[in-house]
């Protein structure tokens, strides 16, 4: 079983965990409809980079 050699101080523990927080994904706004969507994904209306690629929800 692994056992630590020395106790890690609260400061060092915090530095170790500094990058473990969650971030919100960046959203893009569709130029034709103004809807927000994930980058590199189609919008809910079915547009991608200003062009209609699929049928949207409810169509």
Curated annotation (Swiss-Prot):
The yes or no answer to whether the keyword ATP-binding is present is no
Disordered, as annotated region: 1-59
Annotated GO biological process = translation
Q: Which UniProt keywords apply?
A: Ribonucleoprotein, Ribosomal protein
User: Matching Pfam families, A to Z?
Assistant: Ribosomal_L32p (PF01783)
Indicate yes or no for the key word Zinc: no
Q: Report the GO terms under cellular component.
A: large ribosomal subunit
Give the protein family.
Belongs to the bacterial ribosomal protein bL32 family.
- Which PANTHER family would you find in this protein's record? 50S RIBOSOMAL PROTEIN L32, LARGE RIBOSOMAL SUBUNIT PROTEIN BL32
The protein's name in its UniProt record: Large ribosomal subunit protein bL32
Taxonomic lineage of the native organism? Bacteria, Pseudomonadati, Pseudomonadota, Betaproteobacteria, Rhodocyclales
What would be the name of the gene that encodes this protein?
A: rpmF
């Amino acid at each position: 079983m692994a056992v630590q050699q020395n106790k890690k101080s609260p400061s060092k523990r915090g530095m170790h965990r500094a990058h473990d927080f969650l971030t919100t994904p960046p959203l893009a706004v569709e130029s034709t409809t103004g809807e927000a969507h994930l980058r590199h994904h189609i919008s809910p209306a079915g547009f991608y980079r200003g062009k209609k690629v699929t049928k949207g929800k409810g169509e």
